[in-house]
Amino acid sequence: MSIRIGILGYGNLGRGVECAIKHNPDLELVAVFTRRAPETVKILTETAAVYSVNDAEKMKDKIDVLIICGGSATDLPKQTPEYAKMFNVIDSFDTHARIPEHFDSVDAAAKESGHIGIISVGWDPGMFSLNRLYANAILTNGKDYTFWGKGVSQGHSDAVRRIKGVKDAKQYTIPVESALEAVRNGENPDLTTRQKHTRECFVVAEEGADLAQIENDIKTMPNYFSDYDTTVHFISEEELKRDHSGIPHGGFVIRSGKTGWNDENNHVIEYSLKLDSNPEFTSSVLVAYARAAYRMNKEGQSGAKTVFDVAPAYLCAADGAELRKHLL
């Protein structure tokens, strides 16, 4: 019998989840919930239906896992605990500093209802977090490094779009090659924010806008650009559509450490991602963890979980014997 999946929110992430379900025969999409008028939302799966979010509670016996595809700033802190009262839930909450409090609120709701809520699933947090944990457990004497990119940062692109005189924009985060090489060589450098990444902006300005002012507003923006070397390019709307319409991303998690009685041997563990579509990859991770949530809940587990709490075998459609035979 298929694991029945619901999607809450049908933007880039929700559409990505729908595509990922197509590639997982043991999963079945039964419902998409939206804040928009349901009749205006066209989905790709003919056997599923679109409902208003207000109807979610009526579906709680028809859905095994609800994948919540909202934003981390305002949606997920409310939605994940709320829907954990009705369903097993998965989210991609990625505000790193606020993960502990988000975990606690989801944990309380999920324990009370007997459901599981796996939070902060994706690639960072998510796959990168797992690789940090494995590397730290193995090389206890060492240093962690995370590099992001080259890729489009949605949050930074939005921040540029909010500047007066900006019609549209894309921002790329780019690792500094010399810093990456130093880490890979086991040099264990101490790197500042500015030494690890640069930022590159492609901006379509409103007609008659002050370009020098826009560039200054970008480069001096606190929390986003002021700590980085930033390059700003002004381009036409056509160029932006033609050359910058994708949502690629990726990055590297590296731990460099020493072993031996006198720390005489160096080791470098590296995990990297190169993604054509950030939301579609994130969605694929969410779907694997939906399978895990269903299985863990069937075993009687409840409460909030993170990727650290999920044994790898729960993620795969294959059973233990198959995994031991083919992947071990």
Regions found by a protein language model. Name each.
Residues 127-143, 158-168, 292:
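Oxidoreductase and adenylate-handling cofactor-binding alpha/beta cores
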